[in-house]
Amino acid sequence: LESISKQYEIRNLFSYQESGIQLTYNRDKAVAEYCKIKDISWHQYQRDGILRGIQNRSGWDKHWFVTMHSPIIQNTFSVQQPLSIESPYPLQHELEQQLNNYPNQFQPAGEDAAFKYLESFVSGRGLLYSKNISKPLESRTSCGRISPYLSWGNISVRQAYQFVYNHS
């Protein structure tokens, strides 16, 4: 944040709540302190049914199902000019080129690809999910294959849940 704030005036910081490990908890505390010192409004949004700071899990599942069944917000963001932020740790040109050449053996990226995997899961591949999930070879062809899309934020857990729920 400090390096970005040297290039831009930051008034608001937007992020989503996550559950993680001690490292991410400590990071969040440091971000909160930084925002307080610099008078930055930090807006954290709930995502994937995460409940932070609960004393126990009583009622957690009910809250999760309510969250998963709530309407999905439609993204109306329009393309803006890219923001140029100079990295204090620039990549070597050769490594940057390698990273820009997306390997064909990887799952295709993006939201459309995520929904294609979900569609193939509910229309056939998922039929043997319970039987094959613990089998290394068979699980590749019967599991959802949506982890990368969830990890990179191409789709949300709520979108995946509602898709499977509505197609079952």
Tell what function each PLM region has.
Residues 1-114:
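Beta-rich, aromatic/charged-enriched effector core domains that present basic-aromatic interfaces
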Residues 73-168:
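Catalytic cores of enzymes that engage adenine nucleotides and/or redox cofactors via long glycine-rich
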